[in-house]
Amino acid sequence: VLRVLKGFADKNLQNINRYFASGWNRDGLALRAAGDLLQYAPGPAPRHLLIVLTDASPNDSRRIPPSPEKPLGCGYEDAAGVADTAAQVRALQRMGIRVSAVFMGEDSSAGAAAQIYGKNMARIRGMDQLARAAGRLIQNEIRELGD
């Protein structure tokens, strides 16, 4: 279940603090939903930058459905979850959406973060570093616009 806390044109910030975490994080699905939102309600901006706060450890209790490559399906965790999330990042990029990530996860997930987000990532160790890291990512995107 996804809930839009604030639309692009919404000036009211009251709902923004109604976010809460609960359970699993199927990152690929969340990225796909973000792409759908930007495609069907793009707002006034001609370009979009999506900054994701992540632990780079996508997992879910629901399995990935069977496919020709995996007739029995597989668990949404580890390599399968990372591959799905990375595929969704690439799909957003093909749509023209810039995707960057602030990674706040375990050392063991750093490789997954790099696989998913590539160079468009900043690592933080605490929430007090979030604003600075997001600012650096935004500056990098602005620099690339000038190239």
Predicted features along the sequence, with ranges:
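Acidic, glycine-rich A-domain
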Residues: 1-147
